[in-house]
């Protein structure tokens, strides 16, 4: 059978690099052929973090960063192809998520905005690009997120097996696969790594808390934890989605101001528990027991996985590796899958997940010609 090669490009709210994956969809399950992470240069990272919050001169900064991110994504593709020794002519299309700089679906006229000019990516790689996956769903009254549950359903669902797929990136999201004819459900639970990363970056200038070791050295403060979990987002009914607009450094500093007597490692432990408790609450609401498979950066945080397991005694906990998908690359593979769905003219959103009025083909095609 002829290969069906697509590339997926993903940079999430954690902004810890651009993941590029080459995936073959010619078989019944996606096959990861090659993967690469392109680091985000510090000057670009600072610009993106600034743009995620309201500020002056936004349109000029947006325009420049849109091109800069497009160039970085193109570099990620070219380095991936060099690493794999695959010719650009063998790739059907690139699926590019872009970099989210605003996600505000709940306004009177909701919107979401991802940058990383697909024209630039197409021009600099010589490969057609499919991008702008979220805004069609928003135009249909949906949240535009999460989009990965449709991929999770096709890849991980099994008859008579109740499964939850938990993706822990900057924001955490769950997909409930009931194993029956019931609707698949999915939504953002709240912060994943974004606040624990922000705190260790602020205090120690380290990019992330490896294995949760710093959090493990601290003691959770119950009063701070209760305050953090009182955020209105956690009591919203799904469909729901969130991002840095709600959970960011400025919000964190505001929450911490009455608790400046706490040790820094105790704050880190409490932030980790905020992530774990908010996830566990939503998982238990979906089903008190079942199988839980974790992907995303959080799957590699030993302390996070241990705390989550303790909060979910009714669940068998593992990573998506047990289902044949490397947890580090799962989201990149999902955006290659979204590109494939667009190329074949197939819908890729789940209205029961996003709240859209109907299924739709997502994304637009940007030709390299």
From Swiss-Prot:
Reactions performed catalytically: 1,6-anhydro-N-acetyl-beta-muramate + ATP + H2O = N-acetyl-D-muramate 6-phosphate + ADP + H(+)
Residue ranges crossing the lipid bilayer per the database entry: none
InterPro entries: Anhydro_N_Ac-Mur_kinase (IPR005338), ATPase_NBD (IPR043129)
Entry keyword set: ATP-binding, Carbohydrate metabolism, Kinase, Nucleotide-binding, Transferase
Amino-acid positions noted as binding ATP in the UniProt annotation, renumbered to this chain: 12-19
Pathway named in the protein's UniProt entry: Amino-sugar metabolism; 1,6-anhydro-N-acetylmuramate degradation; Cell wall biogenesis; peptidoglycan recycling
EC code(s) of this entry: 2.7.1.170
GO biological process: 1,6-anhydro-N-acetyl-beta-muramic acid catabolic process; amino sugar metabolic process; peptidoglycan turnover
EC class of the enzyme, as a word: transferase
Molecular function terms, GO-annotated: ATP binding; kinase activity; phosphotransferase activity, alcohol group as acceptor
Gene3D superfamilies associated with the record: 3.30.420.40
Domain of life where this protein originates: Bacteria
Pfam families: AnmK (PF03702)
Family the UniProt entry places it in: Belongs to the anhydro-N-acetylmuramic acid kinase family.
Task of the protein: Catalyzes the specific phosphorylation of 1,6-anhydro-N-acetylmuramic acid (anhMurNAc) with the simultaneous cleavage of the 1,6-anhydro ring, generating MurNAc-6-P. Is required for the utilization of anhMurNAc either imported from the medium or derived from its own cell wall murein, and thus plays a role in cell wall recycling.
NCBIfam families, per the entry: PRK09585.1-3, PRK09585.3-2
Full protein name: Anhydro-N-acetylmuramic acid kinase
Phylogenetic placement of the source organism: Bacteria, Pseudomonadati, Pseudomonadota, Gammaproteobacteria, Alteromonadales
């Amino acid at each position: 059978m002829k290969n069906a090669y697509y590339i997926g490009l993903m940079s999430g709210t954690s902004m810890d690099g651009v993941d590029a994956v080459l995936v073959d969809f010619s078989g019944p399950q996606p096959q990861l052929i090659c993967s690469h992470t392109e680091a985000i240069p510090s000057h670009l990272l600072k610009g993106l973090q600034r743009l995620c919050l309201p500020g002056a001169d936004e349109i000029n900064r947006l325009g420049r960063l849109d091109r800069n991110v497009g160039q970085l994504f193109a570099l990620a593709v070219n380095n991936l192809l060099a690493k794999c020794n695959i010719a650009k002519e063998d790739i059907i299309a690139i699926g590019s998520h872009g970099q989210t700089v605003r996600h505000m679906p709940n306004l009177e006229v909701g919107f979401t905005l991802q940058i990383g000019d697909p024209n630039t990516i197409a021009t600099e790689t010589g490969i057609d690009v499919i991008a702008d996956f979220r805004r069609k769903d928003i135009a249909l009254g949906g949240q535009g997120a999460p989009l990965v549950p449709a991929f999770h359903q096709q890849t991980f669902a099994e008859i008579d097996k109740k499964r939850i797929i938990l993706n822990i990136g900057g924001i955490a999201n769950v997909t409930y696969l009931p194993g029956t004819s019931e609707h698949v459900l999915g939504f953002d639970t709240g912060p994943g790594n974004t606040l624990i990363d922000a705190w260790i970056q602020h205090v120690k200038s380290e990019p992330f808390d490896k294995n949760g070791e710093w959090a493990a050295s601290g003691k959770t403060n119950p009063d701070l934890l209760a305050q953090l979990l009182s955020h209105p987002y956690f009591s919203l009914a799904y469909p729901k989605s969130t991002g840095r607009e709600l959970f960011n450094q400025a919000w964190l500093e505001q929450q911490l101001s009455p608790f400046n007597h706490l040790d820094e490692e105790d704050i880190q432990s409490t932030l980790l528990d905020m992530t774990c408790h908010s996830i566990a609450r939503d998982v238990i609401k979906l089903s008190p027991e079942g199988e839980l498979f974790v992907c995303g950066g959080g799957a590699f945080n030993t302390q996070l996985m241990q705390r989550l397991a303790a909060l979910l005694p009714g669940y068998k906990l593992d990573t998506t590796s047990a289902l044949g998908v490397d947890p580090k690359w799962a989201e990149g593979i999902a955006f290659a899958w979204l590109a494939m769905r667009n190329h074949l003219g197939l819908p890729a959103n789940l209205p029961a997940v996003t709240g859209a009025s109907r299924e739709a083909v997502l994304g637009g095609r940007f030709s390299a010609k």
